[in-house]
């Protein structure tokens, strides 16, 4: 029996997000490498992205912790680093690992698979989050406030307990979470600079009605989240004019100065058009001017990019 279509689509979406398959479904070179590892694609992704001995060892410990049941109390913090440090501390003492024994056995299997060394040092502060962001790119989270509420890169909302130290971090990488409530049970802080390699660059030149002018930013995005935004340099005049023209039908009444003088001229031309249709006079109503801004704005706008500058355009001359 074939699996449900929804499950197939979800699996395809995951594999594409991990770079394992192309948009049309063909396997990538990275996907072939992932397929050689006998583990979940997320874990395979994490093991392959761990490109230093220290990260490789850490990835095997994270994989083991995620595969087994959380050995720490439910009321403990959600920081995965706490579990990694506890595992390494128990392993470093040798002898009876007690509740960590099963997890260490799994970690040893992953070390063998990844040809990684045993490492009991405390990892770098953001190393755990870096690896989680590779395995769970759709669960990269940015704080909405300072009280534990986050937005995920996939657009969903998530949260950690406001008393959890994790809530003080602007960026988190989630691992284990409740998809219904959005609660993150295991996560780790991540340095946004570490995410730049998996971010996509977008140049956005658009009219910002709130600030009354053009916004021209080059953004680094992960899903719906913005990592950084910098002003776009160079000659962007053509794009600026297009953005103004695109906004004119909706916001034009506040962008341009439709003075009484302009209104009087529009009415006179409208009357002349109705009395003498043979003149075939153009429609110079507000709606027509704004809908057809691309026809006249380039000749009159100069370098205007704000409401104050656009309102200096003499619409009587335009008409």
Label each PLM-derived region with a short phrase:
Residues 22-51, 56-63, 148-150, 156-158:
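Accessory beta->alpha helical hairpin/"wing" motif in late/C-terminal subdomains of nucleic-acid enzymes
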Residues 1-18:
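C-terminal helicase lobe
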Residues 2-7, 29-33, 65, 78-84:
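A glycine-rich phosphate-binding loop feature that marks nucleotide/adenosyl-phosphate handling sites
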Residues 4-8, 40, 55, 103:
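Generic structural signal for well-ordered, non-membrane alpha-helical segments
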Residues 163-167:
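A short, sequence-level motif marking secondary-structure junctions
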Residues 55-149, 170-319:
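Acidic, serine/threonine- and proline-rich low-complexity intrinsically disordered segments
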Residues 22-24, 153-155, 162, 210, ...:
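Short acidic-glycine loop/turn motifs at beta-strand connectors
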Residues 132, 137, 154-156, 160-162:
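Nucleic acid-processing catalytic cores of prokaryotic defense/repair systems
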């Amino acid at each position: 029996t074939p699996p449900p279509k929804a499950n197939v689509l979800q699996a395809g979406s995951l594999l594409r997000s991990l770079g394992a398959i192309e948009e049309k479904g063909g396997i990538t070179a990275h996907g072939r490498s992932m397929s050689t590892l006998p583990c979940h694609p997320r874990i395979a992704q994490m093991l392959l992205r761990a490109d230093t001995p220290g990260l490789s060892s850490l990835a095997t410990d994270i994989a083991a912790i995620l595969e087994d049941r959380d050995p720490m109390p439910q009321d403990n913090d959600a920081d995965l680093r706490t579990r990694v440090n506890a595992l390494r501390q128990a392993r470093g003492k040798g002898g009876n690992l007690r509740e960590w024994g099963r997890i260490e056995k799994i970690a040893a299997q992953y070390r063998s698979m990844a040809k990684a060394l045993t490492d009991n040092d405390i990892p770098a502060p953001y190393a755990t989050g870096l690896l989680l962001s590779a395995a769970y790119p759709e669960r990269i989270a940015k704080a909405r406030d300072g009280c534990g509420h986050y937005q995920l890169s996939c657009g969903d909302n998530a949260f950690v307990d406001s008393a959890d130290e994790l809530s003080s971090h602007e960026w988190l990488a989630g691992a284990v979470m409740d998809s219904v409530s959005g609660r993150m049970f295991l996560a780790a802080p991540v340095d946004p600079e570490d995410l730049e390699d998996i971010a996509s660059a977008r140049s956005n030149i658009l009219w910002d009605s709130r600030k009354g002018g053009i916004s021209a930013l080059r953004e680094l995005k992960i899903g719906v989240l913005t990592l950084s935004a910098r002003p776009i340099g160079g000659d962007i005049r053509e794009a600026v004019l297009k953005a103004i023209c695109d906004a004119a039908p909706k916001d034009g009444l506040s962008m341009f100065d439709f003075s009484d003088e302009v209104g009087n001229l529009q009415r006179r031309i409208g009357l002349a058009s109705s009395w003498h249709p043979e003149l075939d006079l153009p429609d110079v109503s507000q709606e027509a001017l704004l809908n057809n801004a691309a026809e006249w704005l380039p000749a009159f706008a100069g370098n205007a990019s704000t409401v104050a500058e656009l309102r200096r355009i003499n619409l009587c001359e335009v008409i």
